[in-house]
C-alpha cells in the first residue's frame, strides 16, 4: 500500500533540489508521473474512494503549497499562445488530453464575501460522471496579494484535490510584471480613477486567462467567480453547438448578464486575448466582447434560453458594493431540452424586419414574426440529414402578443428529398395533426410514420388577419 510517509519523502527530496531549477523541473515532472500512477490505484478518474480522500488532500496540499512549490515551469507545453506571458502554476496536474470545453474563471480578493469555492463546487456538482471527462476548469487567481493567493490555493486544494489530480482543475497566476500600466489611465465615461483601474486590470486578467486556455479544449466558456450552474449544463451546450453545425458564429450566450456564459471557439481565444489587451483601458470587458463579436462579422446576439448560469454574489468585487443582479431566464433543473438537429429553414410568408425564420428554431432568444399569412403558406424545416423524431412541439404567439398565433394550421413531416432551384424539398408529406390554440405537440412520431424524416412543415390552412409569431420549434430525436 502506498503510504503517506513515502509521498512526504519524495517531496523532501524535491525540496533539496530547488536550487537546480532546470533539473528540478525534469525531476518534478517525473515524480508527478510516478505520483499519478500510484494514485490511480485509489482514484477512478474523478471519484476518490472515501477512505483515501484525506490522504489525497494532504498530499496535494503538501505538493502544491505556494510558498514551497510555486515555480514558473518554462519547460512545460506552451499554453500561452502568442502573448509572451510566463504563468505560475499554483495547483496543477498536466492535462492528459484535449477536452471539449474549458471553463475559465478569474478571481480577485473581495472586500466582502467570497464565492469562488461555491462556483467551482457548482461546476463539478452539476456535471455528470461522463460530463466531467469532457471539461477542464482553469482558475486565474489574479490578485497581486500573495498572501490571499496562498490562502485560496490551500482552500481549493483541500476541497477539490481529486479534481486537480484527475487533471480537470488548474489554478494559475499571471505575475504583476506582465501587466501594462494601471495607474493614471484616461477616464472614459467620467468613471472615477479607481474604477478605471479596476475595470482595466480586469480586462488584462481575462486576456491572460484566455491566452492560457487557447489549446486546452475545443470550446471555452467565460464565467465570473460568483456563479451557479444549471444541472448538466455541458449537455445543453453540446446540443446547441450541434444544432448550429454549418452556421457561422463567434459568440454564443448562455446568460444575459455581463460576460457570464459567453462561449467561444478556442481557436478565437488568442486574438480575443490580444483584443482585450489592446483596448484594456477603453471600456468594461462586456462592452469589448460585444465589439469583438461585431468585428468578426457576427451581427446579431445569439443567446439561448433558459439561461445556464446565474449570478449568485451579493457583494461586487469592486469596492464590495451590493450587486443584486439576477437572470430571470435561469433554470437550475433543465427539463427535457430539445435536440433540434442541424437544418435549413424556409418560408413564403412575408417576414417583418429581421424576425427571420431561423429565430424560431431551437432555443435562440428571438422568434419568427410574419405579416398575416394566407391559406397555403408554409414554414419548412429541412434537416441536413434524415432524422428519427420522437417528439415535436411548436409554440406561436407571445405573452405580449397573444393574438399573433397560428389560428388555423397543421403540421406535416416528409421524406424523399429532391432538389429544386438549389433548394432541397420533400415531395411527399404525412399530416401529424392540427394546431390547437396556436400550439402543436405530438409524441412517439417514430411510431406513427414509416420513414426517417427529411422535412417538417407548418401549413396554414386558413387565411387570418392577425400577424403570426412562431415563438419556438422544438424537436427531440431518437
From Swiss-Prot:
<dbReference type="Pfam" id="PF04666">
    <property type="entry name" value="MGAT4_cons"/>
</dbReference>
<comment type="similarity">
    <text>Belongs to the glycosyltransferase 54 family.</text>
</comment>
<dbReference type="InterPro" id="IPR006759">
    <property type="entry name" value="Glyco_transf_54"/>
</dbReference>
<protein>
    <recommendedName>
        <fullName>Alpha-1,3-mannosyl-glycoprotein 4-beta-N-acetylglucosaminyltransferase C</fullName>
        <ecNumber>2.4.1.145</ecNumber>
    </recommendedName>
</protein>
<keyword id="KW-0808">Transferase</keyword>
<keyword id="KW-1133">Transmembrane helix</keyword>
<keyword id="KW-0812">Transmembrane</keyword>
<dbReference type="GO" id="GO:0008375">
    <property type="term" value="F:acetylglucosaminyltransferase activity"/>
</dbReference>
<feature type="topological domain" description="Cytoplasmic">
    <location>
        <begin position="1"/>
        <end position="23"/>
    </location>
</feature>
<dbReference type="GO" id="GO:0000139">
    <property type="term" value="C:Golgi membrane"/>
</dbReference>
<keyword id="KW-0479">Metal-binding</keyword>
<keyword id="KW-0735">Signal-anchor</keyword>
<feature type="transmembrane region" description="Helical; Signal-anchor for type II membrane protein">
    <location>
        <begin position="24"/>
        <end position="44"/>
    </location>
</feature>
<feature type="topological domain" description="Lumenal">
    <location>
        <begin position="45"/>
        <end position="478"/>
    </location>
</feature>
<dbReference type="Pfam" id="PF23524">
    <property type="entry name" value="MGAT4A_C"/>
</dbReference>
<comment type="function">
    <text>Glycosyltransferase that participates in the transfer of N-acetylglucosamine (GlcNAc) to the core mannose residues of N-linked glycans. Catalyzes the formation of the GlcNAcbeta1-4 branch on the GlcNAcbeta1-2Manalpha1-3 arm of the core structure of N-linked glycans. Essential for the production of tri- and tetra-antennary N-linked sugar chains. Does not catalyze the transfer of GlcNAc to the Manalpha1-6 arm to form GlcNAcBeta1-4Manalpha1-6 linkage ('GnT-VI' activity).</text>
</comment>
<keyword id="KW-0325">Glycoprotein</keyword>
<feature type="glycosylation site" description="N-linked (GlcNAc...) asparagine">
    <location>
        <position position="348"/>
    </location>
</feature>
<feature type="glycosylation site" description="N-linked (GlcNAc...) asparagine">
    <location>
        <position position="84"/>
    </location>
</feature>
<dbReference type="GO" id="GO:0008454">
    <property type="term" value="F:alpha-1,3-mannosylglycoprotein 4-beta-N-acetylglucosaminyltransferase activity"/>
</dbReference>
<dbReference type="GO" id="GO:0046872">
    <property type="term" value="F:metal ion binding"/>
</dbReference>
<keyword id="KW-0333">Golgi apparatus</keyword>
<comment type="pathway">
    <text>Protein modification; protein glycosylation.</text>
</comment>
<feature type="glycosylation site" description="N-linked (GlcNAc...) asparagine">
    <location>
        <position position="215"/>
    </location>
</feature>
<dbReference type="InterPro" id="IPR056576">
    <property type="entry name" value="MGAT4_A/B/C_C"/>
</dbReference>
<keyword id="KW-0328">Glycosyltransferase</keyword>
<keyword id="KW-0472">Membrane</keyword>
<dbReference type="GO" id="GO:0006487">
    <property type="term" value="P:protein N-linked glycosylation"/>
</dbReference>
Amino acid at each position: 500500500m502506498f503510504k503517506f510517509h513515502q509521498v512526504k519523502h519524495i517531496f523532501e527530496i524535491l525540496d533539496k533540489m530547488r536550487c537546480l531549477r532546470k533539473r528540478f523541473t525534469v525531476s518534478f515532472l517525473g515524480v508527478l508521473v510516478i505520483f499519478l500512477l500510484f494514485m490511480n490505484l485509489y482514484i477512478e478518474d474523478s471519484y476518490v474512494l472515501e477512505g483515501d480522500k484525506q490522504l489525497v488532500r494532504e498530499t496535494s496540499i503538501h505538493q502544491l503549497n505556494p510558498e514551497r512549490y510555486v515555480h514558473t515551469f518554462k519547460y512545460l507545453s506552451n499554453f500561452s499562445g502568442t502573448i509572451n506571458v510566463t504563468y505560475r502554476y499554483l495547483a496543477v496536474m498536466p492535462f492528459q488530453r484535449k477536452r471539449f470545453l474549458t471553463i475559465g474563471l478569474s478571481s480577485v480578493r473581495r472586500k466582502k464575501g467570497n464565492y469562488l469555492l461555491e462556483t467551482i463546487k457548482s461546476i463539478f456538482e452539476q456535471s455528470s460522471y461522463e460530463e466531467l471527462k469532457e471539461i477542464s476548469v482553469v482558475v486565474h487567481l489574479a490578485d497581486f496579494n500573495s498572501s490571499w493567493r496562498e490562502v485560496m490555493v490551500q482552500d481549493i486544494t483541500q476541497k477539490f484535490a481529486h479534481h486537480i489530480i484527475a487533471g480537470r482543475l488548474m489554478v494559475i497566476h499571471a505575475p504583476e510584471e506582465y501587466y501594462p500600466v494601471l495607474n493614471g489611465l484616461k477616464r472614459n465615461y467620467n468613471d472615477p480613477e479607481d474604477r478605471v483601474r479596476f475595470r482595466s486590470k480586469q480586462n488584462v486578467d481575462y486576456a491572460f486567462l484566455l491566452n492560457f486556455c487557447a489549446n486546452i479544449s475545443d470550446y471555452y466558456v467565460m464565467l465570473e467567480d460568483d456563479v451557479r450552474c444549471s444541472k448538466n449544463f455541458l449537455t445543453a451546450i453540446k446540443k446547441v453547438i450541434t444544432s448550429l453545425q454549418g452556421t457561422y458564429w463567434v459568440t454564443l450566450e448562455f446568460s444575459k448578464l455581463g460576460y457570464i456564459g459567453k462561449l467561444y471557439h478556442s481557436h478565437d481565444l488568442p486574438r480575443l486575448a490580444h483584443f482585450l489587451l489592446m483596448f484594456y483601458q477603453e471600456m468594461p470587458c462586456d462592452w469589448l466582447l460585444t465589439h469583438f463579436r461585431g468585428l468578426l462579422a457576427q451581427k446579431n446576439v445569439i443567446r439561448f434560453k433558459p439561461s445556464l448560469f446565474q449570478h449568485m454574489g451579493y457583494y461586487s468585487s469592486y469596492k464590495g458594493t451590493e450587486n443584486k443582479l439576477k437572470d430571470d431566464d435561469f433554470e437550475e433543473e433543465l427539463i427535457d431540452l430539445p435536440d433540434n438537429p442541424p437544418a435549413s429553414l424556409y418560408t413564403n410568408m412575408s417576414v417583418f424586419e429581421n424576425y427571420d425564420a431561423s429565430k424560431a428554431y431551437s432555443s435562440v432568444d428571438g422568434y419568427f414574426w410574419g405579416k398575416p399569412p394566407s391559406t397555403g403558406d408554409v414554414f419548412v424545416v429541412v434537416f441536413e440529414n434524415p432524422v428519427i423524431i420522437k417528439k415535436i412541439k411548436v409554440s406561436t404567439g407571445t405573452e405580449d402578443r397573444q393574438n399573433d398565433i397560428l389560428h388555423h394550421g397543421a403540421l406535416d413531416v416528409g421524406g424523399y428529398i429532391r432538389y429544386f432551384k438549389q433548394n432541397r424539398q420533400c415531395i411527399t408529406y404525412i399530416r401529424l395533426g392540427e394546431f390547437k390554440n396556436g400550439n402543436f405537440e405530438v409524441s412517439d412520431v417514430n411510431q406513427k410514420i414509416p420513414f426517417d424524416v427529411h422535412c417538417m412543415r407548418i401549413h396554414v390552412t386558413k387565411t387570418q388577419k392577425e400577424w403570426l409569431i412562431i415563438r419556438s420549434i422544438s424537436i427531440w430525436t431518437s
